[in-house]
Each structure stands twice: as structure tokens, then as C-alpha cells.
């Protein structure tokens, strides 16, 4: 057995001695880095994280690391582009309920700011299917790989002051994957080009 396996077995023995039921799961390595990491999670009805595993028990990971296949999207009835009126509809579910759509038929776009060492700030447009959720740990790791700088923080941009200070000429009620770079031209400390990430 490798040293890594021996350490894992030692942890398992300690937990058993303490009377704890644990599951060893794949986990994000975080700031420590490394190709792989194992985390021991105590099984309980309540806690700060979830364990995702296959029915066979051959794979287990925490939410930050888990890999899965998305559910099948519901196809649109036709491929004809059309404008939708969406007054007072601020969420994916509200748009779907009022327009006879399924969340898998909509693209969700979220703005983030990647803050790197040396006050280098990159605006991010993260695009994902409307029935999915953005895993911010995975997004952080992906952005860190895309740039040659050390990523310090990834912040979702939601507050009105930050939006008004850094974004101009936003299309009313629409932030899409094709949002023009001119919308960030007025920002004093953001890069002037969107990094677009589509899943």
C-alpha cells in the first residue's frame, strides 16, 4: 500500500475507534493543491455538506467535487427565435411559469468578478442551463487554470452599487451570453473584456 493509502487507513481506524460512521469521498484540494484529495465525512441527517454517491457505492464525492451527467433537457417545440415579454419576471421559475417553458430551455447568466493578485480584476459571464446551479468552487478552479495569475477571490456581482459603478448600457432585463464588452468600458479597475464560461 502507498503512503497515501496507509494514512487513509489510519484515519478510518481513528474514526472507528471514536464510534463515528464515515465515508471517504473525493474532495476539492483547495489552496493546498494537488491532483486529488480525499475527505472523510461523518454521515448524519444534518450538516454543512452533502455526500453524492452511486447506488453501487463505487463512487462518492462532496458537492464541490462531484461529477455527474445533467438530466435530459426538454426540447423547444420549434427552432424559431421569438421575443418574449417578461414584465416583473425576475427568476427562471417566474419566466418559465408565465411562458410555458421548462428551466432546461433557458440559459442562466451570472456575473462574477475574479480578483487576482496585483489588483487584476476580470469580469466573468458564467452561462449554464436554467435548471442547473453554478458550482462556485469548480468555477473558481476553472478560472484559476485559465489565467496565469493567482486567483484570490471570486465574487458574484449582485449589488446595485457595484453594477451601476462598473456596468453601462445594460440591456433592460436581459444579461445574455453575448453581452457586449462595451458594457464594462466605464469600469475603472476591471479588465475591459468579458471572460465567457459556458457549461
Give residue spans per PLM region.
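Extended, low-hydrophobicity, polar/charged segments
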Residues: 1-199
